[in-house]
Curated annotation (Swiss-Prot):
This is Microtubule-associated protein 1 light chain 3 beta. Ubiquitin-like modifier involved in formation of autophagosomal vacuoles (autophagosomes). Plays a role in mitophagy which contributes to regulate mitochondrial quantity and quality by eliminating the mitochondria to a basal level to fulfill cellular energy requirements and preventing excess ROS production. Residues 121-125 form a propeptide. It comes from the Eukaryota.
């Protein structure tokens, strides 16, 4: 069972900065993304991992399809993705643009997902 602690709670700021430095050094065309289930989410499963290296040319709709597939959701199940705790992002936006505008000070791009429009904003496919 995955930990109830968030990625930021499990790794120190210094560890996260070093993780990003190594990732960007070894994979310069990949975006380091942390995707976690919204803390109040009950219907959607927890992902088997939280850290993803997303090719920088991928757009948000492709990323959503990948996450939906990993969660094994059917077409009728609602799925909303929130970037950096507050942002609604167009599904046609490349992940590289989202990363540049929304990355955390540690260098990761953080996202949470839920089955409802819990956030007041939504990104759905």
């Amino acid at each position: 069972m995955p930990s109830e602690k968030t990625f930021k709670q499990r790794r120190t700021f210094e560890q996260r900065v070093e993780d990003v430095r190594l990732i960007r050094e070894q994979h310069p065309t990949k975006i380091p993304v942390i995707i976690e289930r919204y803390k109040g989410e009950k219907q959607l499963p927890v992902l088997d991992k939280t850290k993803f290296l997303v090719p920088d040319h991928v757009n948000m709709s492709e990323l959503i399809k990948i996450i939906r597939r990993r969660l094994q959701l059917n077409a009728n199940q609602a799925f909303f993705l929130l970037v950096n705790g507050h942002s609604m992002v167009s599904v046609s936006t490349p992940i590289s643009e989202v990363y540049e505008s929304e990355k955390d000070e540690d260098g990761f791009l953080y996202m949470v997902y839920a089955s409802q429009e819990t956030f007041g904003m939504k990104l759905s496919v």
